[in-house]
């Protein structure tokens, strides 16, 4: 699937809505190992993403992806901002050569792994991205596969060096 500026805006709008709808739950999940503010941080970041996309109305994908990255880096605290920001910066760089979503997600995942040092099995976002990115490439991603990927992380033990 080709990612366009319009699809990026729709994706970010839907993602922002999900984050805002679930920010209390995300903060609750963060409480045992963090400071319980992940939902609020992500909501603040995604609201900034939407504001930036609406204000600047990018006409090309690279610019749109950079706007997303910069909003996340500047507004989301702790590790999530730099990790998501890196993902979107890597996508922005790669989008100069390709708008293929699977390719963009692959470089985003590589950026996340390099930035955070996580690997499969560390109970991080890498455990989801690593499993589901190939599903995007195969055009076989389903809600059931997403749910299964999430469930598969439930009993993983978090790598304490990454907390």
Where are these regions (language model features)?
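N-terminal loops that bind phosphate or other acidic moieties
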Residues: 1-163
């Amino acid at each position: 699937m080709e990612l366009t500026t319009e699809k990026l805006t729709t994706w970010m709008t839907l993602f922002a809505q999900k984050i805002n709808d679930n920010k209390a739950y995300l903060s609750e999940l963060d409480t045992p190992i963090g400071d319980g503010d992940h939902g609020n941080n992500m909501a603040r970041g995604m609201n900034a993403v939407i504001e930036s996309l609406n204000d600047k109305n990018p006409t090309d994908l690279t610019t749109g992806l950079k706007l997303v990255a910069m909003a996340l880096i500047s507004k989301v605290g702790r590790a999530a901002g730099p990790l998501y920001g890196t993902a979107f910066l890597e996508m922005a760089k790669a989008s100069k050569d390709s708008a293929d979503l699977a390719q963009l997600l692959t470089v985003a995942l590589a950026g996340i792994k390099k930035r955070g040092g996580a690997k499969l099995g560390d109970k991080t976002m890498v455990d989801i991205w690593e499993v589901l990115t190939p599903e995007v490439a195969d055009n076989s991603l389903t809600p059931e596969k997403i749910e299964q990927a999430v469930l598969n992380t439930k009993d993983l033990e978090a790598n304490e060096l990454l907390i």
